[in-house]
Amino acid sequence: MSAFARMTGADARWNPEGLREDSEYRDLGLAAVTNGRIGAKHIRTLKPMAAPTGWHWHDMTAHYVFVLRGSLTFRFAGVAGDVTLRAGDGLSQPAGVPHNVIARSDDLEVIEINEPAAYGTWDLAEPPAPWT
């Protein structure tokens, strides 16, 4: 890292602009001190999940999710069955793996860490096997 980064609860600046309209985001400052190599954000939901996210993938080399509160359920290409994370659970997702968030609690809060900080999200026209 190129600098110390400390963020307190008083520093929290929640931003409704992010990947999902039903959530808000708080940048945890890693992108600034790593010159964009690593991103970290605190995400919390604002309203009930209306529908699954749909199959998509992220253009990143590393993706880690840690659940602070609530739960969420994924489907991943190449993984049989659903994967549910609850408070205290973490998941390291391989780069580029198609996935679909099919359920989440209304009180969900997570920390996401990704590499790089800025990345693209690509929707898939069709679900991958075996979900077709």
Language-model features and meaning:
Residues M1-K47, T121-T132:
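A short, N-terminal "cap"/entry segment at the start of jelly-roll beta-barrel domains
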Residues E17, A51-D59, F76, V83-T84, ...:
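Short histidine-centered beta-strand/loop micro-motifs
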Residues I38-K41, S92, S105-W122:
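A short hydrophobic beta-strand segment most commonly corresponding to one strand
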Residues H42-R44, D89, H99:
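Hydrophobic/aromatic beta-strand elements that line small-molecule binding cavities or substrate pockets
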Residues M60, V79, V97-P98, D106-D107:
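A generic "binding-loop/recognition-motif" signal
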Residues T34, G81, N100, Y119:
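Flexible, glycine-rich phosphate/dinucleotide-binding loops
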